[in-house]
Amino acid sequence: MSDPAQEVEAPVEAAPVASSPKGKKEKAPKAPKAEKPKSDKPKKPKAAPTHPPVSEMVVNAITTLKERGGSSLIAIKKFVAAQYKVDVEKLVPFIKKFLKASVAKGTLLQAKGKGASGSFKLPPAAKKVDKPKKAPATPKPKSTKPKRVTGEKKVVKKPAAKKPEAKKATKAAKPAAKKVAAKPAAKKAAAPKPKAAAKPKKEVKPKKEAKPKKAAAKPAKKPAAKPAKKPAAKKAK
């Protein structure tokens, strides 16, 4: 029999443990971030400018300064800043653009320099760029005339409704007018009688026949005078 001490139990191998890298921890997957809902707030409207247009401010500066050699860009900037109380540095590019365009059009004269630098002045007959205000429309006097015409038309229309009655009156008067017309026809027939009585008066003209008697009396006087003169001449011898 073998001794129990001699029998050595074989060691039991342990299961291999999975080795994990030191310092590295497995990260859990991140949940996707919820998108923030966009707020539908209305955009604020841009504030209206409290100053007039750049063109008006520049022209006003040049006309007010009245410099003989023209107003420079620096002088225009100072005037605009003092008069209108605006941030001139923001308006400088617009002022330069207006000056160049005005010189090209001829609304401004460049006394010195080139481009936006130099001095500028208005031409002698140039007018301000200010837009003329529209005059209020004056009421036209013609509006009173149509009222009178409409009144006259109404007056004319009223007797037009009574025309049928006038026609009846004229129809009734026609037979009476025929009777009256028959009476002057009888008078016309009687009128020729006095004309026939007047004809014999024209035929009586006995005065014209007395003229030949005077002509017969003249030759009777002449032969009686001639024989009396001849014997008187013989006695004178």
Curated annotation (Swiss-Prot):
InterPro entries according to UniProt: H1/H5, Histone_H1/H5_H15, WH-like_DNA-bd_sf, WH_DNA-bd_sf
Top-level taxon of the source organism: Eukaryota
Compositionally biased region (Basic and acidic residues): 26-42, 200-209
Ranges for domain H15: 50-124
Subcellular location: Nucleus; Chromosome
Alphabetical UniProt keywords: Chromosome, DNA-binding, Nucleus
GO MF entries: double-stranded DNA binding; nucleosomal DNA binding; structural constituent of chromatin
Ranges where the record places region Disordered: 1-56, 109-237
Cellular component terms per the entry's GO annotation: nucleosome; nucleus
Gene3D superfamilies xref list: Winged helix-like DNA-binding domain superfamily/Winged helix DNA-binding domain
Pfam families: Linker_histone
Extent of Basic residues compositional bias: 210-237
CDD domains linked to this entry: H15 (cd00073)
GO biological process: chromosome condensation; negative regulation of DNA recombination; nucleosome assembly
Compositionally biased intervals (Low complexity): 1-21, 182-195
Family: Belongs to the histone H1/H5 family.
Known function: Histones H1 are necessary for the condensation of nucleosome chains into higher-order structures.
Protein name per the record: Histone H1E
Biological source species: Chironomus tentans
Biological classification of the source: Eukaryota, Metazoa, Ecdysozoa, Arthropoda, Hexapoda
